Amino acid sequence: MNTYSRFDISFKKGKGSWLWDKRGKRYLDAVAGIATCSLGHSDRVLRRRLSTQLGKIQHISNLYNIEEQEQLSRTLTNMSCAKSVFFCNSGAEANESAIKLIKKYGNKTNKGKESIILAAESSFHGRTLAALSATGQPKYQKGFEPLIQGFKFFKFNNFDSVKKLFEECENNDQKISGVLVEPIQGEGGVIPGSKIFFKSLREICDRYNSLLILDEVQSGVGRTGKMWGYENLGIEPDGFTLAKGLGGGHAIGALLVKEKANIFSPGDHASTFGGNPFACKAALTVIEEINRRNIINNVYLRGEQLSAGFEELSKKFPNIISGKRGLGLIQGLVINDDYADAKKITLKAFDKGLLVVPAGGNVVRIVPPLVISRREINILLDKLNSIFEEL
């Protein structure tokens, strides 16, 4: 079906931060399957572990205990504030799970009041109907009305707008059951959450007995220079969702929760493929290799290098670049609307053998593999410099 505007290219192989097309042209990959290929392409350890797993068992369903799933669950909970995990196959599924969880929590605690879920303007939570309804971008929702009701939207990083919604719901016999929000808005324009905002958000959720669930589909698993995006904010959520980088290019999603939010019972929710042995082995390998190779430190260092390079580009091309923002290896250059657009720059980068991806607000988004090297960041910056010189 015609659901993608694709580049007219097919890649035949990849290694680390590089991809090769059928003609042998090499591309530096600063997209990483949209923040997904954490260990890069064709990682030796991941390849070996998954080859071994294929010779054992791939899928049996959640009718039975799954050793790899149990190992992954222990690993994730030992490394985070969460105590329990539900596994699925994607970010949209993980966020659908979170929405169902918030709704059930509300029905248990709201004492008959209408249940409301808060989400942020410019957010992105997925393409399935509930996740789409929670997404604060009308351009994605157009044509799919009526959306699921019960969502209200606040301005990201603006606590006054959150407080106003809590007060309005209180006066209208409604109850905010939970808040679903990204620690750093990816599709919305690579906008990091502020510590002050999230501290206030945590406090008001506690005051009103509302769940705070973070969408870490794009920010989790080391992407920001911390293992979890919430670690940059000085708070702990009641739960958070993962996907993308968790599987290193293999389909897996997860909803992790503290005990307070561990309210699903058998039959409440399920996934046929969720947490299958193959996907869990991929995720276990990604987490283990991130720890073994100290990849989080690389993300921090390369993020600092990238940010410094963006600062230099901003000074050199002030008419083109109006700002930079991001954390670790999820960063964006804000392009001046009057001069160029991010899609045009994406196309020019493609011609020069550099893969980047646009984000909202006319932003060129950079989300390379977490293993990208110092030399490769310099190549990336040189290619961007060349593009801006030609504009």
Q: Where does each model-flagged region fall?
A:
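Conserved N-terminal phosphate-binding loop of PLP-dependent enzymes in the Aspartate aminotransferase
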Residues: 1-391
